[in-house]
Amino acid sequence: MNNIYISLYIFFISYIIQLCFNTKYIYCDKKLYVSKNILPSVEKKEFVSNVPHKLEWLVHNILEVVHFLEDVNNYIVDFKKDILTKLEHIVQDDTELYESYEYNENLLNQIYLNNEKKLKRYSEYIEKLKDTKLQMFEDTINNFQRENIYYLNFVYKNLLAKIDLITNLNKKKLDKEKKKNVIELKEYLEDLKKRMFDMQKRLNDIIITKSTFLKNESELNMKLFETSAIDYVNNNSNFEVFSTYIINDFMLNKKRINVLNYDSNLFFKNNFMYFNFLHNYLKEKKDEHVLNVYIYLKDPLIQEYELNYFNYYVVLDLYILDVIIKNVDLLIEKKGKKRKNVNHILVCIDNYVVKYNVLSSNIYLDIQQDIKSFFHESNRNVDGSKIQDMLFHFERKNNSIYQNNMFHDKYYKKKIKKDIKEEKKQNDSLQKYNKNIDPLLFIRKKNIFFDSQKEYYKKFLSSYTYEEIVNILCNKSSRCNNRIFQLINDVNKNTFILKSHLALKNELKKFFQINQNKLLKNKTGVGLINSTKDDINRITNMNLATNTNNAMGNITNDSNIINTNNNNNTSDINNNNTSDINNNNTNNINNNNTNNINNNNTNNINNNTNNTNNNSNNNNNNNIFNNEDSLNKCSAYTYPFSNDAEKNYQENRNQSFSNSDHCFKLLNSIQGANKSSDFINMQNIDDYLNTYYVAYHESFKVVKKEHYYSVISHIFESYLNIDESSNDDDHPIHKKYPHLKGRNVSINFLGQLPEIMKVYKTFRYCDSLNVLAKSYIPKSPASVQSLDKGEDNNDNDEKGESGEDTQVIEKDDSGEDRQMIEKDDSGEDRQMIEKDDSGEDRQMIEKDDSGEDRQMIEKDDSGEDRQMIEKDDSGEDRQMIEKDKSRDDNKAQNNNSTDNEEHDEITEQIGFLKNHNQKYMRLFQKHLLEEIKFINFFEFLVQKKLGVILEKNEFLKLYIFYGQKNLPSMPYTPLFFTCRTIIKIEVLRDVNTNQIIYSSRSFFLETLITLKEYKIKNESAYIVIETTDESSTIKKRLKMDMLHKISPMSHINAYVISNKGKEIVYHKGNIYQRSASDIKNVISDIRNDFLNIILPQYHLFDLFDNYVYIIICLKNENC
C-alpha cells in the first residue's frame, strides 16, 4: 500500500509542476497578445498593476490544486475500500471452493467403492457365465461328434451300397459309353469318400485339442459345485435364505388364500422333489392345516399368435376350487377322517382341460432290466427266499447309487454314534435280510431329492421305491400275496403302475415325513433322533381316503361330464340359476332342495345320466358310501396297508386272497355315488388313479396368458375382502361356494409339468379325453352348423329357450342318453369285469368298433345330420327370416344386455370377463369339432370297411388310409395330440418308369423321431413326408441318365405342420428313397416298416401314441 501512496504523490507533484509551467506559458502569451492589440494608455495601466493580478492567479491555481488533491484523496480512500471488499469476497470464494473440493473428493471415493463392488459382482457373474458356456460348448461338441459319427457311418454305408451296385453293373456286358459313365461315377464316389474321411479326421483333431481344455473346466466346475453343496449342508450358502423366504411367504402367510407364481423360477422347478417333500411337509405350521393347491400349466406354444386360441387359459376360479374341495371332503368323509387332515391337492390346467389330483400325481415307474427279472413270468412263485433276494438286491442297488451321491462324505461323518445305534434298534427289519448293511444307508435315502442335476431321483424311483413297495405289500415278512406280482406283470411289460394308489402314497409320504424330520433335526443340530409314536400317530392322522381310488375309478360313462355346484342347504341355488350350471346338461340338477349329502331318502331325485335307477334300495347298493358288504368281503385285499393288515391276512387268507381276482374286479366295477354332484364324473377314470376331470362349466373364465396370474389374484383377493360378520353364512358368495368357507388355502403356481410327472397314455385315457372333448361341443345342430361355417354369433344361448333346443334336449333325454344308460346297465360293468381277466385291449377295441363309436357314427349319419337337413328344408329358412326381422329391433338391446348383464360374480371385472367369454370358447369348440369329425371319419371307415387298414394290438391302433378325396381337415389341437399321431405320406409316380417313389425306411425312422421331439416340447404337430422331382441339371452334370432309369433322381422332404406354420425338417436326396410298381406294395412296405421293424427293433413303443394315422396319397393325382 505504501508503494501505491508514494507513486500517487509523485504523480501529483509532477502534475502540479506541469500545471505551473502551462500557466506561465499562458501568461506570457497573454502578454504578447496585449502588447499588440490594446491601447497605449491601457497598456500602461496594466503594466503598473501586473503584480497583484499575478498573485491572485497563483492563489486561484493553488486553490484549484488543493481541491483537486482533496478529490484525489477521497477517490483513493473509496478505491481502497472497494479493493478491500473485493479481497474479502475473493477469500470467501476460496473457502467455498475448498469445501466443494472436499465434498467432491468424498463423492468420488464413494463412486469408486461402488464401482469396485460392481466390478466384483460382474466378475463373479462372468465366471459363472463362463462355466455355463463351457458346459454348453462341451455338450454341443459331444452332440456334434455323435451326430457326425452317425451321419458319416450312414453315408459311408450308402456309398458302399452304391459301389456294390456299380460293381454288379460292371459284371454285365455294358456299352463303352455306359462303362465310361460308371467309371466316372465310381471315381467321383471314391473322391467323395476321401473327402468325408478327411473331414472326419479334421473333426477328430479339433475334438482332441478341445477335449483337454473342456475336461479341466468340467473338473473345476464339479469341484465348485461340490463345495457349494457342502456349504449348503453346513448352512453356509444363500440357498437357506432363498428357502426361508419361500417358506415365510409360502407357508406362514396369514392370509386364508395365498396366490404365488413360480412360473419363471427354474431353480424351483428343477428342485421340485425337494420342495414338495421337504418344505411343504416339514416346515408348515403344526397348528394350522393349510390346503395346498399346486397348479401346473401346460403351455403348448413358445411363440404366441394373437388370433390363435392357444393364447387363452382357463382360470382356476372359486367354482373349480370349491368343486375340488367338495370332492376331497367327501373322500375324507367316507374314510371317517376329518377335513382338516387333507392339505395337499394337485391341479393341472391343460388349456381348457382342468383336472386335479388328490395328494399328488400318479406314480409311474420304468422297470430296469435288473429289476424286471424278479417280475418275469417264469419267476411268479413268490416265497420267503425270493423276497429276501429282492430286498438284498434293492439294498445293494441303493448302495451303488448313493456311492456317487455328493453328500455322502462330510455330511454323513457328522452322524453321532448314538444316533446310529438308535437307528439300528428302530430298523431291525434291515438286519433281517442283511446284517452287513451300512448303518448310514437309512439316512442316505433322504438326500435323494437334492441332486436334480444328476437326476438321481430317476434311479431312486426305480430301486428304492420298489424296496418300499415290497416291504408294504409283503408286510416285511416272507408271506406275500402272489396275485400282486401277477398284476404287476400283467399291466404292462415296460411300465410298472402302482396298483395300491393312495395307500402306497400315504405309506411313502409317512416314511418321507418321519425320516426327513430326523434329517432336519440333524442338520440344525437339535439333538438325537427320536421317532416317537406321537410322530407316527400325527402322520397317520394325515392319511386320506387311502383305498377309494378303485372305487372311484369307474364312476360313470357320461358324455357330458358336469359337476354342478350342489348346495346342502334349502333353497338350493342350483334351481335359481339352472342356466349358469351348464348349457350342455340342463338335466344334471338336483331337484330336491332339501336333500343332504348323506341323506339316502327315496326322494333324492337326480336326473344325472349316471343314475340308472331312482329306487332308494338300488341307490344304497350302488353308492360307494353304503356298499359296505361287498367291500368288507375284500377287506384284507382292499386294506393291506392298515395296522390290522397281518390280522386280516390271518383271518381272511383263504377267503380274500384266494378270491383276489373277484375283489379286484369288484373294486373296479363299483358304481359311482348316485347323489347329485357328489363326484366329478369321467368315463374310465381308473387309469388316472386319483385324477378327476372338471369339464366345461359356464363359470369358467378364459383369459390371456399375460393376464392369468393377475386375474387369479384378483378373484381370490376379492373373496378375501368380503366383510365377515355374524351373519356371514347368508352372504351370497358363501352360499355359492360353501366348501371354501373356513379353509386355509394356499395356491401355488409351479409352471409347466416337471419331467417326473408323466402320464402313461392308455386307450381308456384317450377315450376319456374324447368324451371330455365332446362335452365342449354344443348339442344344438344349429350351433354345430354355425361352428362349421365359422359364424361368430351369440344367438345360440338365446335359442336354448326356444323349441329348437328343446327338441334336441328331448331327443337327448329319450334317445342318446337312454341308450347310454342301458349300455351302462347291461354291458359296461360286465365287460369291465371280463376285461380284467382275459383281454383288456381286445374287448375294449371290440367295444369301440361295435358299441359306442358305432352308435355315435350312426347318430351322425342317420340322426343328427338328417335332422339338420330336414330343418334346413322345412323350418330354418323361415326361422332365420323371422329372426332377421326381429334382429334389427333387438340388436342394440342385446348388445347393451351383454355388457350390462347382471351376474353373480364377486367383482365387475370377472363379470365382464364372463359376459365376453363366448368368442374364445367358440374358437376352441371349432377346433374340437374338427378333431371329433376326424376321429369319427376313420371309425366309420373301419366299420364300413372302406379304404382303410386297421392294425391293433395291446399297445396301439394303426390306421392306414389311401387317398384323400373325402378326408376331413387334419387338426393339431393339444387335446387331440395327447393321444394321436398323424403321418401323411405323399408318394410320387415317375413319368419315365411308371414306378412309385417313396421314402426309405431310415428316412421314415428319422422323421418319426423328429415328430415325437416336437410333441415332447408341447408343440402340437403332424408330419408330411413328400417326394418331389429334381431338376435335370444335376443328372446331366453327373452323367447319371443310366442310373436314373433304374432309380429316378428325386428328393424326399419332411414337413412338420403345427400351429406355428409349415416347417421343413429334412431335405434328402435319392439315397433315402425306394420304388415300387404298385401302390399296394407301398402300403405293405410302410405297414411292415412301422409294425415289424421300427417299433419292435428300435423299442419305440413309448415314443408313439396309442392311435397312429398313416395317410398315403399319390402326388399330383389324389393328394
From Swiss-Prot:
Identification of the protein by name: Uncharacterized protein PFC0810c
Compositional bias (Basic and acidic residues): 788-891
Key words of the record: Coiled coil, Merozoite, Signal
Native species: Plasmodium falciparum (isolate 3D7)
Coiled-coil segments on the chain, per record: 170-206, 890-920
Chain residue ranges for the region called Disordered: 606-627, 782-905
Uses in biotechnology: Possible candidate for an effective malaria vaccine as determined by epitope response in sera.
Signal peptide (from-to): 1-21
Cysteines paired by S-S bonds: none
Keyword Transmembrane helix: no
Entry keyword Glycoprotein: no
